[in-house]
Amino acid sequence: MHSLQAKILDPRLGSDFPLPQYATPGSAGLDLRAMLKEDTVLGPGQTLLIPTGLSIYIADPGLAALVLPRSGLGHKHGIVLGNLVGLIDSDYQGELMVSCWNRGESPFTIAVGERIAQLVLVPVVQAHFELVEQFDESQRGAGGFGHSGSH
């Protein structure tokens, strides 16, 4: 297991609400909570940038973190991430913020401390461009957008 440096920016986190944790031994994501001042209604089509009360420093350039939606919020209530996926670089040290978007047809109340997203660590492979005049031929070539099959 890797260690992450973390700062608690909202004193309610870790006292009134649990610190991010894995729900089960097989969980990939740490739950992030809405550390709002008060319960907030997110209207249909509306987006809101929500503080998590936490900053992290990954430090290892071989790792990054992804902020991903919680499946239940999206499926049951239409609440997804406004940017679809958040990328946290290894050298970022600011507060983790979650952009929530209500793509549903009904208002949704985000409660203070509610679990709104999950943080997943992923390996990073950095690459450099090797400029070429043409590529070695592949079976697929430049085919895209449905080229490999209909379903």
From Swiss-Prot:
Pathway participation: Pyrimidine metabolism; dUMP biosynthesis; dUMP from dCTP (dUTP route): step 2/2
Requisite cofactors: Mg(2+)
Annotated protein name in UniProt: Deoxyuridine 5'-triphosphate nucleotidohydrolase
CDD domains linked: trimeric_dUTPase (cd07557)
SUPFAM superfamilies: dUTPase-like
Family classification: Belongs to the dUTPase family.
Reactions accelerated catalytically: dUTP + H2O = dUMP + diphosphate + H(+)
EC number, as in UniProt: 3.6.1.23
Keywords on record: Hydrolase, Magnesium, Metal-binding, Nucleotide metabolism
GO BP terms: dUMP biosynthetic process; dUTP catabolic process
Binding site for substrate: 70-72, 83, 87-89, 97
GO molecular function annotation: dUTP diphosphatase activity; magnesium ion binding
The protein's enzyme class: hydrolase
Function: This enzyme is involved in nucleotide metabolism: it produces dUMP, the immediate precursor of thymidine nucleotides and it decreases the intracellular concentration of dUTP so that uracil cannot be incorporated into DNA.
Cited InterPro entries: dUTPase (IPR008181), dUTPase-like (IPR029054), dUTPase-like_sf (IPR036157), dUTPase_trimeric (IPR033704)
